[in-house]
C-alpha cells in the first residue's frame, strides 16, 4: 500500500466530506476558512463533537488531537464551559457590552497572577491581533522601525510577520534570507524585518548587533510551533541581548500559554519577556487574544495619556474582552488549576508519547515525539540507512497520518498533537492501537518497495 492507495481509501471512506467540500468550494475560496485547514484530496467535514471525539459527515469517529489547533484544553463541550456560557448570558443578559464590565478585570488579574512578567493587559479577538498590537507597542516604545523574528516562526496572518513562517532558506548554511509567505505583502515588510536563526545564539547576536539602530522589537515563539524546544540557555541569551541593545522582547505564547505550563513557556524556562501575546486556551474555545507586559510599555495604549491619537498606541475592537470569551476562558483556566489536574494532563501526554515511540520502534522505525508540556509532534524515520534515503520523513509522516485517520485518530495531516483533559485512558488506548496498526501498514509499504 502506497500513499496514493492510502488516499484512495480515504476517498472511499469520506464521500460525504468530499461532497461537502465540492459545495463549499463553490461558496468559499478553496472550500476552507483558513489556508492551513486544507489538505489533499479534501479536508474532513465534521458534523459533531463530544469530549475527545469528532464525528465527520460520513459518521466516522476520531479521537481528536487537533483540538481546534490547540485551543480546547478540556476537549469539546466540557460541562464547565457549557455552564460558563449559560451563566454569563443569564447573568449579564448580553453577549457583548462593548464597554467596560467586571470580567475584564477578573481575567486581567488572573493573567497577571499566572504570568509575573505581565503587569497590565489588553484583550483582542485573536492571537493574530495580539502579536500585531504587541509589535506596535514595542516599536512605539523603542522609536525604531524594524522588527526581528525567527526563521520558521509563525505569529499570525498579518503583514508584519508573514515573513519566513516556513523557514529553511539559508543559502550555503548562512544567515536566513527573508521571503514573503503571501501574495500582496508590500516590500516594506520584507525590508523592515530581520530574520534570525532559532537556537543559534552566535548568529542571532551578530545579526542583532549589526542592526541595533534599526530593530526595536524581537518576537519569538519560545517553543517553535509549540513543539521545537529552545536549546538550553538560548532564551536567556536572547533576553540578555535584547536588554543590552534596547530592544523590546515579545514572547508569542499563543500556542504555549497554559500548555507548556500554566504560566506558559516563560514559567517553564524561567525567562521573562517584556511583552507577551496570548490566545487559544485563554478563550476556552471562543475567540480571544491578549497582550500583556511591563506597565510602562502597556501604558502607551492608555488614552488617558493624551487625546491626540498620534501620541498614543491605538488599540480597539468591538468584541475585545466580551463576556462569552472571558467566561469560558476563566472556566477553562479554573478547571486546569484544580489540584493535580494539569499534572495529570502532563502524565497522560508522556504516556502517549512513550507508547507511540515504542510502537514505531517495534515496527522498525525511528520515532521521536518532540515537544514540551501538553503539545508534541511525531517524527518518523527508518532504521535502515538505505531505506531512509528512499523514504523521506515527510513522506512517512504523510502515510502515517492517512492511516491514522482510517483507524480513528485525527490531528490533521502533518500537524502537531495537542492534549486535553478529556483524553482519558480509553482514548489513549484507542490512539496507541491506531498507531500500532498504522505503523504496521507503513512497514508493509516499505517492505513492498524493497
Language model features with spans:
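Conserved N-terminal phosphate-binding loop of PLP-dependent enzymes in the Aspartate aminotransferase
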Residues: 1-450
Amino acid at each position: 500500500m502506497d500513499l496514493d492507495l492510502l488516499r484512495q481509501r480515504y476517498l472511499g471512506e469520506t464521500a460525504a466530506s468530499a461532497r461537502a467540500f465540492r459545495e463549499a468550494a463553490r461558496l468559499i475560496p478553496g472550500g476552507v476558512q483558513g489556508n492551513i485547514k486544507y489538505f489533499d484530496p479534501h479536508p474532513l467535514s465534521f458534523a459533531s463533537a463530544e469530549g475527545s471525539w469528532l464525528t465527520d459527515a460520513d459518521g466516522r469517529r476520531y479521537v481528536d488531537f487537533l483540538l481546534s489547533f490547540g485551543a480546547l484544553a478540556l476537549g469539546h463541550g466540557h460541562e464547565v464551559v457549557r455552564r460558563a456560557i449559560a451563566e454569563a448570558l443569564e447573568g449579564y443578559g448580553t453577549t457583548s457590552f462593548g464597554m467596560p464590565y467586571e470580567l475584564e478585570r477578573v481575567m486581567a488579574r488572573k493573567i497577571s497572577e499566572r504570568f509575573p512578567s505581565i503587569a497590565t493587559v489588553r484583550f483582542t479577538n485573536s492571537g493574530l491581533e495580539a502579536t500585531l498590537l504587541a509589535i506596535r507597542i514595542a516599536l512605539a516604545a523603542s522609536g525604531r522601525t524594524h522588527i526581528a523574528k525567527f526563521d520558521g516562526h509563525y505569529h499570525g496572518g498579518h503583514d508584519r510577520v508573514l515573513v519566513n513562517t516556513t523557514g529553511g532558506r539559508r543559502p550555503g548554511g548562512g544567515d536566513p534570507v527573508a521571503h514573503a509567505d503571501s501574495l500582496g505583502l508590500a516590500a516594506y515588510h520584507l525590508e523592515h524585518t530581520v530574520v534570525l536563526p532559532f537556537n543559534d545564539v552566535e548568529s542571532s547576536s551578530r545579526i542583532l548587533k549589526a542592526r541595533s539602530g534599526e530593530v526595536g522589537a524581537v518576537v519569538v515563539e519560545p517553543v517553535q510551533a509549540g513543539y521545537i524546544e529552545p536549546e538550553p540557555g538560548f532564551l536567556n541569551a536572547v533576553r540578555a541581548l535584547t536588554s543590552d541593545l534596547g530592544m523590546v522582547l515579545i514572547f508569542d505564547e499563543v500556542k504555549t500559554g497554559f500548555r507548556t505550563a500554566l504560566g506558559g513557556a516563560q514559567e517553564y524556562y524561567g525567562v521573562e519577556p517584556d511583552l507577551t501575546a496570548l490566545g487559544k486556551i485563554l478563550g476556552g474555545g471562543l475567540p480571544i487574544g491578549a497582550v500583556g507586559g511591563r506597565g510602562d510599555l502597556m501604558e502607551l495604549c492608555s488614552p488617558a495619556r493624551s487625546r491626540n491619537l498620534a501620541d498614543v498606541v491605538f488599540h480597539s475592537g468591538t468584541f475585545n474582552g466580551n463576556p462569552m470569551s472571558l467566561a469560558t476562558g476563566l472556566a477553562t483556566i479554573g478547571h486546569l488549576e484544580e489540584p493535580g489536574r494539569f499534572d495529570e494532563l502532563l502524565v497522560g501526554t508522556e504516556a502517549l508519547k512513550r507508547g507511540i515511540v515504542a510502537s514505531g520502534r517495534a515496527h522498525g522505525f525511528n520515532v521521536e515525539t518532540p515537544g514540551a508540556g501538553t503539545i508534541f509532534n511525531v517524527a518518523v524515520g527508518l532504521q535502515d540507512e538505505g531505506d531512509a534515503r528512499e523514504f523521506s520523513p515527510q513522506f512517512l509522516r504523510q502515510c502515517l497520518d492517512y492511516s491514522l485517520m482510517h483507524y480513528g485518530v485525527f490531528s490533521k495531516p502533518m500537524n502537531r498533537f495537542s492534549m486535553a483533559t478529556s483524553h482519558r485512558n480509553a482514548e489513549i488506548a484507542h490512539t496507541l492501537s491506531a498507531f500500532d496498526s498504522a505503523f504496521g501498514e507503513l512497514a508493509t509499504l516499505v517492505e513492498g518497495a524493497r
